[in-house]
Swiss-Prot record:
Residues involved in Zn(2+) binding: 64, 67, 168, 228
Gene giving rise to this polypeptide: oryD
InterPro entries cross-referenced by the UniProt entry: Ald_DH/histidinol_DH (IPR016161), Hstdl_DH (IPR012131)
UniProt protein name: Histidinol dehydrogenase homolog oryD
Keyword vocabulary terms for this entry: Metal-binding, Oxidoreductase, Zinc
Biological process (GO), any one: L-histidine biosynthetic process
Source organism phylogeny: Eukaryota, Fungi, Dikarya, Ascomycota, Pezizomycotina
Keyword Metal-binding: yes
CC terms in the record's Gene Ontology section: cytosol
């Protein structure tokens, strides 16, 4: 696609999800063609208070850890009891024999799983924003508070009725999202990525062109761009 064939014209832009091999392909082709963004392994973050159900938290963390052996699955909670019970349930679920990816999920959880206890909801929102995770589930009494309290994430999943697996499979969530804290400064794939801006300049007034020419000379010479200055001088001498 990026180089074309005898039958297919070379493309100008590559977009879409993929594993680490797709990401490496994009990296190597960056500059040869445009790309949507560089995305790392899937990330899942759960923000929970004392109202959260530990079994639901554990189930959803494992569902995402099964994506690959390098998938971060993190719980931040204000409730130590929720944290402890989540860890216990995760370990039990990972020992189940009916999971299709238990070994993958266990490797991921052992290497990248985290359970963090904070004292207040304020700390919960702040630390969640600091993580800037790809997918953030909010299991709090008022999950919509996250819309006002947070700004760094790929996608929010509000309430225990909204699991990340829905986003993966059935509710049409954007699948090209930010990972590795890049949500701190940009957003995921959107329609603007498929558009480009073209501009043009035209000075229609000779007098204005002359005045701009004098200004151009004064701006260019201190920077030692004499050729720039002379281009402006030409217009100034012609029209002033």
């Amino acid at each position: 696609m990026p180089v074309g064939t005898e039958a297919i014209r070379k493309v100008d832009f590559l977009a879409g999800t993929g594993n680490r091999f797709v990401a490496e392909g994009k990296r190597q082709l960056f500059g040869e063609v445009g790309i949507d963004l560089f995305a790392g392994p899937t990330e899942s973050l759960v923000l929970a208070d004392e109202t959260a159900d530990p079994f639901t938290v554990a189930t959803d963390l494992i569902s995402q850890a099964g994506h690959g052996p390098d998938t971060p699955a993190v719980l931040i909670t204000t409730c130590p009891k929720v944290g402890r019970e989540t860890i216990e349930i995760v370990n039990k679920l990972l020992s189940a024999t009916d999971l299709s990816t238990p070994d993958v999920a266990k490797v991921s959880w052992d290497a990248f799983g985290e359970v963090i206890i904070v004292d207040t909801l304020k700390e919960l929102w702040e630390l969640g924003d600091h993580y800037a995770s790809e997918q953030v589930q909010v299991f709090t009494k008022d999950p919509r508070d996250a819309l006002d309290k947070m700004s760094n994430y790929g996608a929010l999943f509000l309430g225990e009725n909204t699991c990340v697996s829905y986003g993966d499979k059935v509710i049409g969530k954007n699948h090209v999202l930010l990972t590795r804290t890049t949500a701190r400064y940009t957003g995921g794939l959107w329609v603007g990525k498929y558009l480009k801006t073209c501009t043009y300049q035209e000075v229609t007034s000779p007098e204005s062109s002359g005045k701009l020419g004098r200004l151009c000379g004064r701006a260019a010479r201190p920077e030692r761009f004499e050729a720039h200055a002379r281009s402006g001088d030409l217009q100034a001498n012609r029209h002033m």
